[in-house]
Amino acid sequence: LSAPDAKELIDWLTQQPLMYYDKRYHSILVHAGIAPAWDRVMALSHAKEVESVLQSDKIAGFLENMYGDEPSMWSEDLEGWERLRCITNHFTRMRYCDHDGKLNLTEKGSHAPEDCIPWYTAPHRKIDDLILFGHWASLVNQHENREVKPGIFALDTGCVWGKRLSALRLDENKFGNDRQLFSVKGYTKK
């Protein structure tokens, strides 16, 4: 927030989607995850709810009320700041949930507590599109090609800690139709 171009960066950031869907490649890009109870249409709609507040004069109130671990279970009956916080937590903080989809926002490691599962393994998950997500660098050593489950790629490879910055090429390329993972060394301030 003390950067000379902080206002410009914040203005740009508030204009970005919480969920990006590419129809051509049937692929979704999110920061952390998608609530298992949401299908693609619901997820896009819920992302737009938060985006519209971020791009409005209600942004200050949202930022004051955004942080918190509750509610931890999605319900269409949620309203106001609680609803927006729950949506935001799914898109930006989620790693683990229980079998019913209740968030566990305290666990951050690569091994789930006994009563939790990674969000992308939830048995009732409703999205079949390719999903790319970050936010979970501790998965870096568990899956060599970053595909944690068929069609789901964890792209956080620890760049913020001086490790690697990764991306997945989705389009057809000179090597054929196979997806290509690219990874470059990250930069850390000394």
Where are these regions (language model features)?
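Active-site neighborhood of divalent metal-dependent phosphoester bond hydrolases
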Residues: 1-81
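Acidic, His/Gly-rich catalytic cores of divalent-metal-dependent hydrolytic chemistry
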Residues: 44-190
